[in-house]
């Protein structure tokens, strides 16, 4: 995708993400598909390992030990993928490969035997706090803090089991933190952060403190509260959606996120799988499309 595009303010860009569901388009697709619970849980496990919606759709069709056998083929990446060539891996899970990935699959087999769907069910529980969910996630080999955040978000938004997030948990990741620092420096719509001693926090991204990052986050939550959190629309936008907006806005400003980037790329990646999998075809059809 071209890097030559008009750069939007975070207010404009966030409104676009929320209005077009490019914030997390996969979430909407999964809700539309209405997969049986066990298959949805297998889909989630495959996605959390591989970060490819078409591939996860294909793998979700296998049950029991056969699911783990196919997941191990993806981990080893020796046998050709059903779509030809190598089994794809999303950039976000680029470290889930080789010997580490096969050891991850071995751990899952040892723990869940012939019931791969139990992994997502265990991680989800009944929801709870972000820290409770991510603690369960990180019991699993090669499931660290970042994928823990993603799992917690999908438990809340896809499975509909409420997870409460807090700023400290969200802003332990560098990209949203850096984006919030930049926002405080460059965005005149964000009011000054008045400190406890009555002074004003300096508008310098290098000097921004966690307290000022919290100030920025609260401002953005207030700004976007007119939007309901997709895809359920059951509550106003909150910190986890603001985290995603900040991450994608930073990428947008650096020339790496033109409008509709996720929708376009996820659909393109799913299309080859739609030719070999009915579930992948359903996933492709359920994905939101680019709108004008």
Swiss-Prot record:
The entry's keywords: Host-virus interaction, Inhibition of host innate immune response by virus, Restriction-modification system evasion by virus, Transferase, Viral immunoevasion
GO molecular function, one term: transferase activity
Chemical reaction(s) catalysed: 5-phosphomethyl-dUMP in DNA + glycine = 5-N(alpha)-glycyl-dTMP in DNA + phosphate
Domain of life: Viruses
InterPro entries referenced in this protein's UniProt entry, alphabetically: ADDT
Xref: Pfam families: ADDT
One GO term of the biological process aspect: symbiont-mediated suppression of host innate immune response
Purpose of the protein: Transfers glycine to 5-phosphomethyl-2'-deoxyuridine (5-PmdU) to produce 5-Nalpha-glycinylthymidine (Nalpha-GlyT) on DNA as a step in the pathway leading to thymidine hypermodifications in the viral genome. As a final result of the pathway of hypermodification, 5-acetylaminomethyl-2'-deoxyuridine (5-AcNmdU) substitutes for a subset of thymidines in the viral DNA. These modifications probably prevent degradation of viral genome by the host restriction-modification antiviral defense system.
Family statement drawn from the similarity comment of this UniProt entry: Belongs to the thymidine aminotransferase family.
Protein's UniProt name: Glycinyltransferase
């Amino acid at each position: 995708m071209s890097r030559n595009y008009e750069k939007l303010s975070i207010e404009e860009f966030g409104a676009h993400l929320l209005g077009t569901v490019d914030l997390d388009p996969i979430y909407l697709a999964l809700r539309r598909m209405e997969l049986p619970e066990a298959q949805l849980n297998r889909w989630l496990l495959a996605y959390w390992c591989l970060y490819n919606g078409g591939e996860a759709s294909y793998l979700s069709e296998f049950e029991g030990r056969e699911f783990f056998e196919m997941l191990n083929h993806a981990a080893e990446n020796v046998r050709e993928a059903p779509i030809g060539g190598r089994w794809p891996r999303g950039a976000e899970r680029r470290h889930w490969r080789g010997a580490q990935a096969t050891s991850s699959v071995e751990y899952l087999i040892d723990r869940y035997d012939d019931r791969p769907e139990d992994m997502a069910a265990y991680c989800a529980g009944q929801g709870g706090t972000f820290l409770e969910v991510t603690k369960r996630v990180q019991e699993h080999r090669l499931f660290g803090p970042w994928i823990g955040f993603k799992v917690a978000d999908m438990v809340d938004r896809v499975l509909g089991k409420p997870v409460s997030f807090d700023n400290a948990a969200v802003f332990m990741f560098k990209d949203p933190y850096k984006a919030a620092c930049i926002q405080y420096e460059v965005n005149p719509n964000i009011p000054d952060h008045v400190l406890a001693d009555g002074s004003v926090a300096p508008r310098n991204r290098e000097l921004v403190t966690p307290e000022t990052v919290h100030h920025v986050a609260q401002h953005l939550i207030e700004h976007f509260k007119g939007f309901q959190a997709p895809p359920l629309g059951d509550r106003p936008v909150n910190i986890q959606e603001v985290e995603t907006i900040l991450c994608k806005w930073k990428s947008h400003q650096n020339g790496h996120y033109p409008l509709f980037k996720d929708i376009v790329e996820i659909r393109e990646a799913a299309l080859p799988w739609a030719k070999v999998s009915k579930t992948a075809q359903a996933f492709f059809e359920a994905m939101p499309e680019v709108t004008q």
